Amino acid sequence: MKVNIEIAGLPLYKTFGKTKKIAFEFPGKTLKELIDAMVRKFGFEVKKFLLNNNGDIDMDIRVLLNGATYLSENRMQTSLNDGDALIFKAPS
């Protein structure tokens, strides 16, 4: 599956090859599987800036799905579809 990812206000610019937007292909269907694949590909920086100590997305990070829905409860279990757009935003 391929999703489009945008990072807003998080220091992952260098990690993602000096860009804030990437198309990312991964084997999975949930946000957890996406994050796991991102950590495998990009390393500790992704884990450091997106996840809390329990391995969940830090509640201070806002996750916007397809420009319309802010994910809140059980975010890691959110189902994704091919072509979805995700924005990870730092707290304001």
Predicted regions and their residues:
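Ubiquitin-like/PB1-type beta-grasp interaction modules and other compact soluble beta-rich domains
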Residues: 1-92
